[in-house]
């Protein structure tokens, strides 16, 4: 039983991670500022689901910003956390091109505030949500953690790589156990509306036009969110100094095949337009997961069709609870 701080706790991956920690008996303090491109009610709904968890008495939410060093220090001093799970970030490769300064402020400076608190108050484990985007346009795949990651394609990827390197320094200087988890194309219930899987469902159901890059021939390692959350929880217990670990399914699926799976489940056709892939987008993502299997006991067992079915069922259910008589807000 551990005391864990989870940043970004009200978000997509964060809320599933909180549930997984509560399921195993941990005490969780969630930190979230509810400031994202998505509608705030989506995060509020995630929190409402967390408060209905059978062990919700072990969950506390603090509404604050990771860049607020004073609040972060006070939280860590009050709760004496065994671990920090840092999931809060500005996400998205294309938006980072338009707002690169803000991405570095939130993603890098916010991480430094947390690393300083971990150093000052003796937090033993720091788990950081990195991304497969750090691999850039590498033509060697599946991607292994030993590959060079020195040519990111976007400010978002560069900001995540910067925090990985900061983690290496803090682990070396302050004996911090730091695990950077490189997530691969996460999807599932509570998907954000700016993510591809959600956009495709919006297109199938509401006819909203969605670009299909490179005729759908891009490959993605679609990884179900609950498998990711289990990997994050396992990393909390990793006491091996500095580690970088891929969390994917280990299987690259053509985007057009993923579209077809959603269309079959939803009984409709997506409104797609062919466009060349943006320069910031990776042509392929595919994880080698042997290291995660060895160090974390990681075993992603949700195949793409089962995960897509769970996403579709959640999508149908959450439409009824959306504001404005089921309007789901803009797709960004």
Positions of the model-derived regions?
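Proline-centered turn/helix-capping motifs that create local helix->coil transitions or kinks
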Residues: 127, 134-139, 191, 205, ...
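C-terminal substrate-binding subdomain of Rossmann-fold SDR/epimerase-dehydratase oxidoreductases
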Residues: 204-332
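A glycine/serine/threonine-rich, flexible loop-to-helix segment
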Residues: 141-142, 193-203
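Residue-level signature of the cytosolic catalytic core of signaling kinases
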Residues: 43, 151, 189-193, 251, ...
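A short, amphipathic alpha-helix embedded in the catalytic core of nucleotide-handling enzymes
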Residues: 21, 170, 199-204, 231-235
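Hydrophobic alpha-helix immediately C-terminal to the catalytic Tyr-X-X-X-Lys motif of short-chain
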Residues: 162, 166-170, 200, 258, ...
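N-terminal Rossmann-like NAD(P)+-binding domain of SDR-like oxidoreductases, especially those catalyzing
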Residues: 1-186, 226, 302, 310, ...
């Amino acid at each position: 039983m551990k005391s864990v701080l989870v940043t970004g706790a009200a978000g997509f991956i964060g809320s599933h991670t909180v549930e997984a920690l509560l399921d195993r008996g941990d005490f969780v303090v969630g930190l979230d500022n509810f400031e994202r491109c998505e509608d705030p009610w989506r995060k509020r709904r995630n929190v409402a689901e967390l408060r209905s968890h059978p062990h919700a008495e072990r969950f506390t939410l603090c509404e604050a910003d990771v860049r607020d060093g004073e609040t972060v220090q006070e939280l860590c001093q009050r709760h004496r956390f065994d671990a920090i799970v840092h999931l809060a970030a500005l996400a998205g490769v294309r938006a980072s091109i338009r707002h690169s300064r803000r991405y570095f402020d939130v993603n890098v400076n916010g991480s430094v505030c947390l690393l300083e608190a971990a150093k000052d108050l003796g937090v033993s484990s720091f788990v950081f949500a990195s991304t497969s985007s750090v691999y850039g346009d590498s033509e060697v795949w599946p991607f292994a953690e030993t590959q060079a990651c020195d040519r990111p394609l976007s400010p978002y990827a560069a900001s995540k790589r910067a925090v990985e390197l900061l983690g290496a320094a803090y682990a070396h200087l302050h004996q911090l156990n730091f695990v950077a988890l490189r997530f691969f194309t996460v999807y599932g219930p509570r998907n954000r509306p700016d993510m591809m899987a959600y956009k495709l469902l919006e297109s199938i159901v509401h006819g909203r036009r969605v670009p299909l890059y490179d005729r759908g021939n891009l490959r993605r390692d679609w990884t179900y969110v609950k498998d990711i959350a289990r990997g994050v929880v396992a990393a909390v217990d990793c006491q091996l100094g500095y580690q970088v670990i891929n969390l994917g399914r280990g299987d690259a699926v053509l985007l057009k095949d993923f579209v077809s799976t959603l269309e079959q489940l939803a009984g409709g056709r997506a409104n797609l337009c062919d466009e060349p892939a943006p320069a910031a987008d990776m042509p392929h993502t595919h994880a080698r997961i042997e290291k995660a299997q060895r160090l974390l006991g990681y075993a992603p067992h949700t195949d793409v069709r089962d995960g897509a079915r769970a996403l579709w069922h959640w999508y149908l259910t959450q439409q009824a609870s959306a504001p404005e008589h089921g309007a789901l807000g803009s797709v960004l």
